[in-house]
């Protein structure tokens, strides 16, 4: 599985148009999220992943990097190109 540190991701995020998939639950997402993130909770991912463009690279984030790692595993098995954002939103809150 491809991974990126939060700091490296955030540099890209600030300068480029990225596809960011946030796999936290809806209430977590509504409390705090990065602008432009697409919320597809891990608990519903098997039913909603087909909303994603298969021709695009997707960065996947959660609170700490654990759920996003599971989501990356699932999405890569479905043929998606994904990168797990290590540290997740906890790293963002520490900025």
Question: Where do the protein language model's features map onto the residues?
Answer:
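Short, surface-exposed ligand- or partner-binding patches at beta-edge/loop junctions that are enriched
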Residues: 61
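Rhodanese-like catalytic fold shared by cysteine-dependent sulfurtransferases
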Residues: 1-19, 26-57, 66-95
